[in-house]
């Protein structure tokens, strides 16, 4: 029997007070207190746990205290917030507002070449979500901590532009895609096909233009720096130091963001990052531009390779597929895994870092909703869906009789699980 409303309110309110108390005590020990909380992945474990618990309890309280009759009002607000963020990104407002100091609406509208009244409307809605702020009695525009990060962090800017220009238009075609193709499993009958008026698969579409390939790679690198997807969770999901100086083949590794994170944490491991030639060429340049220590870059090399071709690197310690297989239907996922098996040595493992869909309500809602969101995004782009553990088992069982899932782990705060596959 479900808790009564008063019990739920009391439980979540107590959790908010308790978790906030832990975080406040920690903040008071710091020499320079930050204006916003850092990612839970960058603070001591107890503080990170408190941040996650606080976010979940506050989220539940928000929904418990909302009138169910206002659901459409709330959804309308959420939709317009998304629309305003897209508008602000399109006209490059974050980069036009000074990093420090203020700017008038009139001057900002001139710089962006947009109507003053529309600029005010979009900015003031965004301000209710802590994007930008007004300063002074005359209403000057200034950055908030969030918008300043959006303007100054290239990775976040890439993701913002990709969201505005690709993800948002694709999502708006979801209804039309279902109405047109119903239960189609074809990779080229998707919301993305309708949004961008093309007849190939999503990966065909980005491969047709090197700029699209690079844009997609940059957006994936950006996503990997956000809390639920942060590559640091990968470091905590396995005892990587036990591999010594073994080789990790980062298949479909894009710009090498996962390998770089692992290389920085485990100084003996070596890495081969594989992806399409256009991505590899750009990634090598980007690695050089980052000016990372030689102790890191000397252990990372890039290699052009198709996921569906036989794996050329033999006997690696790990073949890593991070957020790769979820892009492909079952049959293609099986082909990708089969391409690896002949290259495996007696101690080789395949690591699948992907979402394992939970039973509804079995994990914090703040984490589950990100997984469910990703589930729909996949369908809109590739006509695939995220998988349950049973789905993953079914795929692995069809690859090779000897290949088995030996271990599954999900780091707290991560939406990705690590499935460890071995030949037994």
Curated annotation (Swiss-Prot):
Residues annotated as the enzyme's active site: 326 (proton acceptor)
GO molecular function terms noted in the UniProt entry: O-methyltransferase activity
Main enzyme class: transferase
The keyword S-adenosyl-L-methionine is annotated on this UniProt entry: yes
Taxonomic superkingdom: Eukaryota
Keywords: Methyltransferase, S-adenosyl-L-methionine, Transferase
Any matching Pfam family: Methyltransf_2
Key word Methyltransferase present: yes
Pathway stated in the Swiss-Prot or TrEMBL entry: Secondary metabolite biosynthesis
InterPro entries noted in UniProt: COMT-like, O_MeTrfase_dom, SAM-dependent_MTases_sf, WH_DNA-bd_sf
Entry-linked PANTHER family: MONODICTYPHENONE CLUSTER TRANSCRIPTIONAL COACTIVATOR MDPA, PUTATIVE (AFU_ORTHOLOGUE AFUA_4G14580)-RELATED
Protein role: Cytochrome P450 monooxygenase; part of the gene cluster that mediates the biosynthesis of bifonsecin B, a dimeric gamma-naphthopyrone. The first step in the biosynthesis of bifonsecin B is the production of gamma-naphthopyrone precursor YWA1 by the non-reducing polyketide synthase albA, via condensation of one acetyl-CoA starter unit with 6 malonyl-CoA units.
Protein name in UniProt: O-methyltransferase bfoD
Species whose genome carries this gene: Aspergillus brasiliensis (strain CBS 101740 / IMI 381727 / IBT 21946)
Native organism taxonomy: Eukaryota, Fungi, Dikarya, Ascomycota, Pezizomycotina
Gene label: bfoD
